[in-house]
């Protein structure tokens, strides 16, 4: 289809009609062969998002659709553009401007996608004639009951997709699919989970959930759905935990839906008691007299340099201005001089922190032992956009180097290949390396149960980042798993872990 690639001089090259000829013939012959037994779709990029260097929707992209008007499945460039994250494309329906012309040149029903989560927007697109059908892939992963809720007028109960592409990462890693909003996704057959229903309680036991981050909120909500009376205690004056922090970073505002959806449902329940600004101690828990305790106490970022690339602390950091990600954002208005963001977690957060600080007009230096910025985000289709965003904003990106040690106001950077040392002057250092679970209260509870009869608990469990630091999706899943597993036979829980669905073709 592209003139820069197709250099034929026969009837299959030259004009756009000739370049489309082979595609049209293949489609027509395929359709003749299969008849009405199945659909034949042609998916191509109506706009490669390369400007004049590629196909554009208002020029040859449209011409191809016009020639094949009754056949095509129009797409916006490759998957990374087709399934953009909310971080880089916050607007719902962002693909509509590229494809709304299709309905005017075909008699076929037209379906469109673009992370459409708002029922009002969906209806408006149909009413104004842009689309006939709404395609909702990621939104229906987040909430499989999306159409039913719209039909029933229960739009306030929709679990809206946050556009994080955790579902896409699962596909790229070839592992069972996961969703930040919907922890039951991928567990329908193996564990029998459903996002709208859950097995009832076994007894009249009460539960205490400590911490209202993603794991704590999910665990509280699901225990209450089962019928248990739940007490939720939060040390802060707001519910949400790490979601509050991360959704406040540049580009991640949609992530707040994770806490907002759960808080809304929790507030509708009459079997949940919520206590904010309540940092519980061992004595407080003993006074409450609740024997089933779920600790969603989160995790804390290390400041000593221990991460993926090194397992021993960096020498010389003790006397320097070293910050955690949370401290860096909180202190941003008062920071000055070069700020180093050191990423040895190699996930998504360090790139967001660097971008946020640069947006605050700081001089930022991004250092990582990896060969690219935020390598894990290749799985969410964001890596190139993240690296581009940092470079465009003026961040000095240094890859393939670790922090060997600190001397005065200098960092000794070590090349991961040659071992060569270089010096870098800085004012503040933000460490994004590794998190340590906050288990102090859990350890006290376990020790008390093992040594005394006072405050004996029938069930003490770490959940979320306090159990194993990970993604928000991981925390939500662990909170859900804890609620589903409560008072259930351990044998059944373990058995489900090893069940594998084996599809067969007939």
Regions found by a protein language model. Name each.
Residues 1-210, 214, 219-225, 229-230, ...:
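Flavin-dependent oxidoreductase catalytic cores
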Residues 3, 43-45, 74-79, 113, ...:
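Generic beta-strand/beta-sheet core signal
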Residues 69-72, 131, 272, 290-291, ...:
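Local beta-strand N-terminus motif with an aromatic residue
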Residues 82-88, 109, 132-133, 244-251, ...:
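Short beta-alpha connecting loops at secondary-structure transitions
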Residues 104, 224, 267, 358, ...:
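Anion (oxyanion) recognition and catalysis
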Residues 106, 129-130, 270, 289, ...:
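Short, structured coil segments at secondary-structure junctions
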Residues 158-163, 245-275, 307-320, 378-405:
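N-terminal glycine-rich dinucleotide-binding loop that anchors FAD/FMN and/or NAD(P) in oxidoreductases
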Residues 201-233, 239, 275-289, 296-378, ...:
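Rossmann-like dinucleotide/flavin-binding elements
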